[in-house]
Amino acid sequence: MPVSRMRMRPWLEMQINSNQIPGLIWINKDKMIFQIPWKHAAKHGWDMEKDACLFRSWAIHTGRYKVGEKDPDPKTWKANFRCAMNSLPDIEEVKDKSINKGSSAVRVYRMLPPLTKDQKKERKSKSSREARNKSKRKLYEDMRMEESAERLTSTPLPDDHSSYTAHDYTGQEVEVENTSITLDLSSCEVSGSLTDWRMPMEIAMADSTNDIYQLQVSPLGSSSEDEDEMKSNIIKLLEPTQDWHTTSVEGKGFFTNEPGTQTMCSTFGYKEQDGEIDTSSAELEFRMMDQKSSLDFSWLDTVRPMQAISCSL
């Protein structure tokens, strides 16, 4: 049979009023606000009689620790005390006044007024209603999971697997269509000669290498010959055109390269026997004629006659 003990709130009030635990005091007794020393053991170190005496007293009160039977465990005492404080419905923490760091760390709590019978009943009914709803919801989910599992495991597989295939009427339609196609093909006449509808096409094939083809490729010429021919053509294009023409003025023959001048025949005596030119009757002189000048050639008399150049007309 469990040992009856005082609940935490009256026990805590008795400890505060006794003033036997250092740091456990009332801040505002009218508002039921008090503080508890809450030093961090790992960072600042604990004094068993000063910092952990409240947690040890609660462990002894709940029977979790007995002096001489177990080794002291201040961290476990503090964790158990914190869980018990958080589970109380009529005590809440005043977080804006608590100090969580440093050697003077404390937690401030407020004791709420005791609940009336109506509040207790309402709270109890609310909690019981929430518990019932939760249990019903869980039961419904479990039933659904069990039904789905049974449906998967208990579904029998048929011995005849013909139901997995397509229906028979589709195959019948296909067979009828195939029969009609076969009948149509049997009525057709197949001719072995295709010359009636194919257009004639003649392909000329070369019988030997001597045949002349429409498309011939000339052999590539030598690169040196092409370069020489190209150079000579460029030189001819760059050189000025000098077409020498024979003309005769006052019985004298001349060579001229000016375009637009009048061309006259010179008086030459030509011997067919030896192919020489007789220049006794006329003297050939080079004269530069200007097509814009007049036909007055009186100034030519002052020019010294030059040696005649033979030419063949």
Curated annotation (Swiss-Prot):
Belongs to the IRF family. The keyword Transcription applies. One of its GO terms (biological process) is regulation of transcription by RNA polymerase II. This is Interferon regulatory factor 1. Transcriptional regulator that specifically binds to the upstream regulatory region of type I IFN and IFN-inducible MHC class I genes (the interferon consensus sequence (ICS)) and activates those genes. Acts as a tumor suppressor. Phosphorylated by CK2 and this positively regulates its activity. Residues 110-162 are annotated as: Disordered. PANTHER family: INTERFERON REGULATORY FACTOR, INTERFERON REGULATORY FACTOR 1. Residues 5-113 bind DNA. InterPro entries: Interferon_reg_fac_CS, Interferon_reg_fact_DNA-bd_dom, IRF1/IRF2, WH-like_DNA-bd_sf, WH_DNA-bd_sf. It comes from Gallus gallus. It is found in: Nucleus; Cytoplasm. One of its GO terms (molecular function) is DNA-binding transcription factor activity, RNA polymerase II-specific. It holds the Pfam family IRF. Keywords: Activator, Cytoplasm, DNA-binding, Isopeptide bond, Nucleus, Transcription, Transcription regulation, Ubl conjugation. Its main location: nucleus. There is a cross-link at K271, K292 (Glycyl lysine isopeptide (Lys-Gly) (interchain with G-Cter in SUMO)). GO terms for cellular component: cytoplasm; nucleus. The keyword Nucleus applies. Residues 117-150 have a biased composition (Basic and acidic residues). CDD domains: IRF. The lineage of its organism: Eukaryota, Metazoa, Chordata, Craniata, Vertebrata. Coiled coil: none annotated.
